[in-house]
């Protein structure tokens, strides 16, 4: 019973870590990063399709991203979707590929992004703590109902605390790395 609860909590915490990674990839750093466009949807023959399924990405230098559509007829729609995306880049279409030159981030913008990273990190840490709370409640109920002994419940709680601490520290480390990346000029 305790092991299943711990395993379930760990799976939930691991999903939170993955969500944190995805959130941090979508934060712009001034470098060309294909991950910025992972959530861009393109109107392709009447249905919205993720950009990653319609084109390949290449970085030609630190600030230039080259997007090559698999189907040339989708070029205009891809350009339109990129222009309307929240990333804030200006795509240029040369008829075969789309080039995006990432503008240099201002110091003020970098600070805003650092705040955003901190806030996202805090949201994800709360999610980890909520998973811990749910698991602890399940363990306490099992002990109270007599399904497991108090010693086993206490041992499970210690493991749960270690698991929570490890995941929170991982989120902190990811946030610190992203902040350093943002503040690097």
Swiss-Prot record:
Keywords attached to this Swiss-Prot or TrEMBL record, sorted alphabetically, are: Cytoplasm, Protein biosynthesis
Q: Does the keyword Protein biosynthesis apply?
A: yes
Mind telling me which InterPro entries this protein's record contains?
Ribosome_recyc_fac, Ribosome_recyc_fac_dom, RRF_sf
Give GO BP annotations, semicolon-separated: translational termination
Q: Where in the cell is it found?
A: Cytoplasm
Instruction: Please provide, in alphabetical order, the Gene Ontology terms of the cellular component aspect for this entry.
Output: cytoplasm
Q: Where is this region: Disordered?
A: 138-160
Q: Where are the transmembrane segments?
A: none
Q: Cross-referenced Gene3D superfamilies, in alphabetical order?
A: 3.30.1360.40, Ribosome-recycling factor (1.10.132.20)
Q: Does the keyword Acyltransferase apply?
A: no
Q: Which family does it belong to?
A: Belongs to the RRF family.
> Which PANTHER family does the entry link to?
MITOCHONDRIAL RIBOSOME RECYCLING FACTOR PSEUDO 1 (PTHR20982:SF3), RIBOSOME RECYCLING FACTOR (PTHR20982)
What this protein is called in its record is: Ribosome-recycling factor
Organism, by scientific name, is Micrococcus luteus (strain ATCC 4698 / DSM 20030 / JCM 1464 / CCM 169 / CCUG 5858 / IAM 1056 / NBRC 3333 / NCIMB 9278 / NCTC 2665 / VKM Ac-2230) (Micrococcus lysodeikticus)
């Amino acid at each position: 019973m305790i092991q299943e609860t711990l395993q379930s909590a760990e799976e939930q915490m691991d999903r939170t870590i993955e969500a944190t990674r995805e959130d941090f990839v979508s934060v712009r750093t001034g470098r060309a990063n294909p991950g910025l466009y992972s959530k861009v949807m393109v109107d392709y023959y009447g249905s919205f399709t993720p950009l990653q399924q319609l084109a390949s990405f290449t970085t030609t230098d630190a600030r230039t991203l080259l997007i090559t559509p698999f189907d040339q007829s989708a070029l205009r729609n891809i350009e339109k979707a990129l222009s309307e995306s929240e990333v804030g880049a200006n795509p240029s279409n040369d008829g075969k590929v789309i080039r995006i030159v990432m503008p240099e981030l201002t110091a003020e913008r970098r600070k805003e992004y650092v705040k955003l990273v901190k806030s996202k990190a805090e949201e994800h840490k709360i999610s980890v703590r909520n998973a811990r709370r749910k698991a602890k409640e399940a363990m306490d109920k099992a002990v109270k109902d007599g399904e497991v002994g108090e010693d086993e419940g206490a041992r499970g709680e210690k493991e749960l605390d270690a698991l929570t601490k490890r995941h929170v520290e991982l989120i902190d480390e990811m946030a610190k790395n992203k902040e350093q990346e943002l503040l690097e000029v």
